[in-house]
Amino acid sequence: MYRDIKFSLWCDFLERDFINGEFLNLIENSVINGATSNPSIFKSAICSSCAYALLKDEYKRKRPKELYEILATTDIKMAANKLLKNYANDDDGFVSLEVDPNLYDDSEGTYKEGKRLFNIIKMPNVMIKVPATDSGYEAMSDLMKKGINVNATLVFSISQVKECLEAFSEGSRAYAKRFPGTPLPKGVISIFVSRFDRLLDKSLKNAGLETSKFGIYNATKAYKIIEQQDNKNIRALFASTGVKGDELPADYYIKELL
């Protein structure tokens, strides 16, 4: 989808029954060619879906984080397998798993957890999602030094984009030096779009100014900076493209960004 303009859609939702059903249909029909997840998505899926009921009973003696990791890494591996053909054909095919958000200010903890989760799943098309914080940048670089793909998340500002690019570049250079001729790890920078407008629109509307535009402007500027690097291993990923309420069409941000 949108391949003629070098855009692709990644599904921002995972749940076990969905992975075994509609998710595969979307891949096979070339609607999506990637996926992302986060702890909130998994919490909703695990708490509301019957697909996890027996597993939760089986692992009920596990601590909450242990139980979460068992269920989440299993789902991520299933999704990665479904996307493996895309990955093999150099058509994206990545799925992301986020580190514990409580580690946002702990670079070493983020790196160790990201490496551990990647090694549990053991799939080449998995990305470890790391928040774009001062500690996160260091962890991103360290993960890439080990050949681990990274999804930099919670990116709102141009300064964050530049920090992510530097972290990716540093990690990739170190990996290339250690393993010359080996394919480099991939990275995406997840630029959050609509949340700017949710914050600003009320004030802009009260001032008689046009609304729901700043997020698009900011994301477009960030995208251009990333594309100027001319690095096929690093791409922009537009996140938070959904709308709230019924004032805007559901696909408003997607169409504007295209």
Regions found by a protein language model. Name each.
Residues 1-22:
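N- or domain-start disorder-to-order transition segments that initiate the globular core
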Residues 2, 27-30, 81-90, 115-122, ...:
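Acidic (Asp/Glu)-rich catalytic clusters
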Residues 20-27, 138-140, 161-166, 246-248:
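Catalytic cores of alpha/beta
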Residues 41-43, 48-139:
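Active-site beta->alpha loop and helix N-cap motifs at the rims of alpha/beta catalytic domains
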Residues 12, 124-133, 148-160:
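Catalytic beta/alpha-barrel core
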Residues 13, 45, 59-71, 95, ...:
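Domain-level signal for soluble alpha/beta catalytic cores
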Residues 18-54:
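An N-terminal structural lobe/cap that precedes and organizes the functional/catalytic core
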Residues 149-258:
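Catalytic alpha/beta core domains of metabolic enzymes, predominantly
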